[in-house]
Amino acid sequence: MAEKFTQHTGLVVPLDAANIDTDAIIPKQFLQKVTRTGFGAHLFNDWRFLDEKGQQPNPEFVLNFPEYQGASILLARENFGCGSSREHAPWALTDYGFKVVIAPSFADIFYGNSFNNQLLPVTLSDAQVDELFALVKANPGIKFEVDLEAQVVKAGDKTYSFKIDDFRRHCMLNGLDSIGLTLQHEDAIAAYENKQPAFMR
């Protein structure tokens, strides 16, 4: 079972760039592992650090600003997560501590992979995202509340509605990944297996 996602209130970091691809999110040289942990240290590695080893933080990159340390909601521009289909991208984001990404649009494969890893991709209009960028930049350290049950983002004195399809919403609310979904049918699977001839078991 994955962690249930119902509501999250967190610090927002504004990454004001469009077409952020998966190679920028987690560069290919860090993809040797197949477990989901440890990738957060290399998130946006080529932007966060001035050296290849990741030891010299880039003071001009927004994730390194003191006011955004501990951010768990990422605000970005359109076509977030484009490029190759590596699932390591949501792994890196969640391992770093992000629970939500808000953007006008997402690459399809990244969007699906996010739900598989309990990272909530929230799609709002360009105009709404513009408003949120202005709000965050005027109020560094502001927190948003993201309510998956109600499908709303509460930011400042405004509320923004978003839509997640029923199946994915059900899975996130109940902490169901692919294994969890399969285990929901464990009894039916066992009954089916018991009906098979012995030589097929």
UniProtKB/Swiss-Prot annotation:
Gene Ontology BP term (one): L-leucine biosynthetic process
Keywords, alphabetical: Amino-acid biosynthesis, Branched-chain amino acid biosynthesis, Leucine biosynthesis, Lyase
Pathway assignment: Amino-acid biosynthesis; L-leucine biosynthesis; L-leucine from 3-methyl-2-oxobutanoate: step 2/4
Swiss-Prot/TrEMBL catalytic activity: (2R,3S)-3-isopropylmalate = (2S)-2-isopropylmalate
Domain of life of the organism encoding this protein: Bacteria
Annotated GO CC locations: 3-isopropylmalate dehydratase complex
EC numbers on record: 4.2.1.33
InterPro entries in the record: 3-IsopropMal_deHydase_ssu, Aconitase/3IPM_dehydase_swvl, AconitaseA/IPMdHydase_ssu_swvl, IPMI_Swivel, LeuD
Molecular function per GO: 3-isopropylmalate dehydratase activity
Coiled-coil region list: none
Pfam family, one: Aconitase_C
Enzyme class: lyase
Keyword Lyase among record annotations: yes
Subunit structure: Heterodimer of LeuC and LeuD.
NCBIfam families, A to Z: leuD, PRK01641.1
Function: Catalyzes the isomerization between 2-isopropylmalate and 3-isopropylmalate, via the formation of 2-isopropylmaleate.
Family statement: Belongs to the LeuD family. LeuD type 1 subfamily.
Protein name as it appears in the record: 3-isopropylmalate dehydratase small subunit
Biological source species: Salmonella schwarzengrund (strain CVM19633)
